[in-house]
Swiss-Prot record:
Pfam families tied to this protein: THF_DHG_CYH, THF_DHG_CYH_C
Gene3D superfamilies given in the database record: Leucine Dehydrogenase, chain A, domain 1, NAD(P)-binding Rossmann-like Domain
Organism: Clostridium botulinum (strain Langeland / NCTC 10281 / Type F)
Name of the protein: Bifunctional protein FolD
Bridged cysteine pairs (disulfide): none
Source organism phylogeny: Bacteria, Bacillati, Bacillota, Clostridia, Eubacteriales
Gene: folD
InterPro entries in UniProt: Aminoacid_DH-like_N_sf, NAD(P)-bd_dom_sf, THF_DH/CycHdrlase, THF_DH/CycHdrlase_cat_dom, THF_DH/CycHdrlase_NAD-bd_dom
């Protein structure tokens, strides 16, 4: 029988610990605070912003939102970032991606203070992960994948894991993190030939391609553990992942649902990183 790997159970456990830690910070008159930088008014960004603010409010984490024009000059953005880096009450900084095309992504990411880089966007923080050091901030989504697997006692050592994503946001950092846990990792992408033949041999498949219900049962074997990272909208306007959940759910060993899967843990880990930063800087 297929096991459903609910992320909201993992998130709840993390939040219970965060409540205790936030109370201790409050005794020192420290309130964890996140700065959110959003360029433009894309509906997806606004929805994500609201969900983060709502999650922060539930844990008494403060937020400061900087609503910026998509046409903002790079020098003006960097001045704002310098100000936020120097603001002692700000413990974490999150910049929504993708950036407007006229901004240099590396320059923007490099402008975030290392100790406030709660989603691991700075090249030096990413470099640390590629060197096998998982002691600092990690990208929230890849970390969420690993936290769910750990929560359900799925040992990564020696596992053959296929990641369908090669971005610096998910695929590449996740591959390095999994290697640090002694997994054997294969990265696939849009140019991969005969993808199902590769995924079907894997113990664990992580998909993050952003295509609603594209992945069907022929991609898996009966023991496959399926981690669906994507949050898409189907033809009926309902949230779904890359995997056709109803088609697959009885034909694999375990699977994360969408919603209530990886996404719920991703947001919770962002909150954890804010609290981590507040504690380190207290």
């Amino acid at each position: 029988m297929t096991k459903i790997l609910y992320g909201n159970e993992v998130a709840l456990k993390i939040k219970e610990d965060l409540n205790l830690r936030i109370d201790k910070l409050k005794e020192k008159n420290i309130i964890p605070k996140l700065a959110i930088l959003r360029m433009g008014n894309k509906p997806d960004d606004i929805a994500y912003e609201r969900s983060i603010i709502k999650s922060c409010e539930k844990l008494n984490i403060e937020t400061k939102v900087e609503e910026l024009s998509e046409d903002i000059l790079e020098e003006d953005f960097l001045k704002l970032m310098e100000s936020l880096n120097n603001e002692k009450e700000i413990h974490g900084i999150l910049v929504f991606r993708p950036y407007p095309k006229h901004l240099n992504e590396n320059t923007i990411n490099s402008s975030i203070a290392l100790n406030k880089d709660v989603d691991c966007m700075h090249p030096l923080n990413l470099e640390r992960i590629f060197e096998g050091d998982l002691n600092g901030f990690m990208p929230c989504t890849p970390e969420a994948v690993i936290e769910i697997l750990k929560y359900y006692d799925i040992d990564l050592k020696g596992k053959n894991i296929v990641i369908i994503n090669r971005s610096m946001v998910v695929g590449k950092p996740l591959s390095m993190m999994l290697l640090s846990h002694n997994a054997t990792v294969t990265i696939c992408h849009s140019k991969t030939i005969d993808l199902p033949s590769i995924t079907k041999k894997a113990d664990i498949v992580v998909t993050a391609i952003g295509k609603a219900k594209l992945i069907k049962e022929e991609y898996f074997n009966e023991d496959s553990i399926v981690m669906d990272v994507s949050i898409n909208v189907d033809e009926n306007g309902k949230l779904c992942g890359d995997v056709d959940f109803e088609n697959v759910k009885e034909k694999v060993g375990a699977i994360t649902p969408v919603p209530k899967g990886v996404g719920s843990v991703t947001t919770t880990l962002l909150l954890k990183h804010i609290v981590d930063a507040a504690e380190r800087n207290s």
